[in-house]
Amino acid sequence: MKRKIYEDLLRWKQEEAGRTALLIDGARRVGKSYIAETFAKAEYKSYLVVDFNRVSQAVTDLFLNYMDDLDLFFLYLSNYYNVKLYPRETLIILDEVQLFPKARAAIKYLVADGRYDYIETGSLMSIRKNVQDIVIPSEERHIKLHPMDFEEFLWALDNEVLMDFIRLHFVKRKPMEQAMHRKAMDYFRQYLIVGGMPQAVAAYVQTHDFDRVDRVKRDILELYRADIVKHAEGYEMKVAQIFDDIPAQLQKHEKKFKFSSLKKEARFREYEDSLFWLADAMVVNMCYNSTAPNIGLKMNMDRMTLKCYMADTGLLISHAFDENGIVSEALYKKLLFDKLEVNKGMLVENIVAQMLTASGHKLYFYSNSSREDTESRMEIDFLIAKSKISNRHNISPIEVKSSKNYTLTSLKKFRTKYQDQLHTPLVLHTSDLKEEDGILYLPLYMTPLL
């Protein structure tokens, strides 16, 4: 499937010319190995894949014993995989490199040698056990691969033009008009319920069978649970608790993560490492409270007040509606036609978080629960900074609305209190684009353009 990260890989190859290795970090089943091998086939004369999920001891011994004799290292590697290596025309892929950290450490010597290019793929790249016995090489360029975004989903459905049409109307700030808006929302609802995991998207493209799509997503969720048991050593129970509680936490009105729902009188610090594990695995997107909308939202971050979104909304649906082990075709069709009588707010807010993350935004929100000052009490779903920072008006508050009837009490109070710091206030909703009273209302499918 066509992925935008391919252009990043091309840029790395052209700019670095072997001076760095490329590390692709991402959740399991997000398409890291596929994109690396697709790139290798198209852009190199030869390539080989060292898959550390099923590597032999003979190969791992090469990394341990032959870094001081790279001529022999490459000779053995070439013969073991029966692949001829061509100087500056061969790519060596180290797949799931976190499973053998010594191979990651060897990148320092392999890159310095300069004969070949290297792409590493992996997840959990920062977890202590994956880095504690190595020096992390400075010769790495690090990029993240997220689930497929809305435009990539459209490409998979053989629609190469709709996002360009949406982009044009976004830039001109003109409504899409009824027919095209309805068409875009139909595609958006498909994206919402299928999600962006490549295997799920492929199943949907091939069959349009929601039962099959759900089985694919459920297999991925089971893989994540198995990874928690296998790799979250020492705190696997807490990681599993958080993971299983995400739908219930997002179903609440405020959506802030309450650790007391996991255990009476539980505190953030007790679960901090477990949250970091899930974030590092890129299974979740963390969103932190920023107590003031100033330049540098991170400087005002309250890291103990947070929201925990699933990294893929399609997975969230399979995770949340799980009474009988599989989400029925009937339920999916109710979601598709906007007929399901549940609080869709958690799904819509989750996919906005997913799309903002894919666009490169760090996730922040604003929460003030003051009991003394009711005018200061407000909740803003997201805060994003504009791309070019100036001395004023840098932060856009975002409210996400899943229904047609809503109020903007918090947004209006927030705008009054922080007017000097704010860029354009935004409302993401199910209706068409409009501007009214200094607020820009955007259809949900325009979120990736922010």
Region locations from a protein language model:
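Interdomain hinge/linker elements that couple catalytic modules in large macromolecular machines
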Residues: D158-V348, Q354, K362, N368
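Short regulatory helix/loop adjacent to the ATP-binding pocket of P-loop NTPases
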Residues: Y109, S126-H142, L154-N159
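A cross-kingdom feature that marks ATP-driven nucleic-acid transaction machinery
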Residues: K13-T20, R29, T38, A42-K45, ...
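Hydrophobic anchor at the beta1->P-loop junction of P-loop NTPases
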Residues: I24
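Pre-Walker A adenine-sensing motif
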Residues: M1-E16
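Conserved lysine of the Walker
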Residues: K32
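Short glycine-rich substrate-engagement loop in P-loop NTPases that contacts/grips substrate
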Residues: S56-P87
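Structural recognition of the conserved hydrophobic beta-strand(s) that form the central parallel beta-sheet
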Residues: I93, D117-S123, K144
